[in-house]
């Protein structure tokens, strides 16, 4: 199937006028195609820009500092680890009362390794070893209550639960009289 070029004579005279006279170089069909291509390009780039990292970071391992304490030990320390955090695509129904709720996915651990540290200053009879998770990879999935705290964030996730260790400073380092925690070799 061949296409025929559109000539200026085929376009109505009122569309070919420029400041009251006929433009002999009028190219409306090509300009319209250029505008469509430009619009398509801008729309496709807009979708790309909206999904870039700074705007909505996806579920992935990130560095985090967590407070570690153990009942019976007089110390609360912080450890650097990786946790799973970020956005997962979710949907909700407009008519929630009529239709059942959709399952919501959250950022979960996919592969995890556990590391252990020895808390300093624990009295005899209290095991000083504490283990914590290190996220190797993450995934968006239903919340597994067996391995994940599905509730909202704690008011102060980097603080210790024991009121003796809660103070106005953000430092959770062990007291200077106690040695630093020692890392134990992984399994």
UniProtKB/Swiss-Prot annotation:
Keyword Transcription: no
Keywords: Disulfide bond, Glycoprotein, Hormone, Secreted, Signal
Disulfide bond sites: 59-107, 73-122, 76-160, 84-138, 88-140, 143-150
Keyword Acyltransferase applies: no
Annotated glycan sites: 63, 80
Signal peptide positions on this chain: 1-50
GO terms classed as biological process: G protein-coupled receptor signaling pathway
Biased amino acid composition, Pro residues: 173-187
GO molecular function: hormone activity
Domain of life of the source: Eukaryota
Localization per record: Secreted
Note: Encoded by a cluster of genes that have evolved by duplication from LHB. HCG-beta is encoded by six non-allelic genes (CGB) clustered on chromosome 19q13.3 and named CGB1, CGB2, CGB3, CGB5, CGB7 and CGB8. Two specific hCGb proteins that differ by three amino acids in positions 2,4 and 117 have been described: type 1 (CGB7) and type 2 (CGB3, CGB5, CGB8). The CGB gene first arose in the common ancestor of the anthropoid primates.
Family listed: Belongs to the glycoprotein hormones subunit beta family.
Protein name: Choriogonadotropin subunit beta variant 1
Record gene name: CGB1
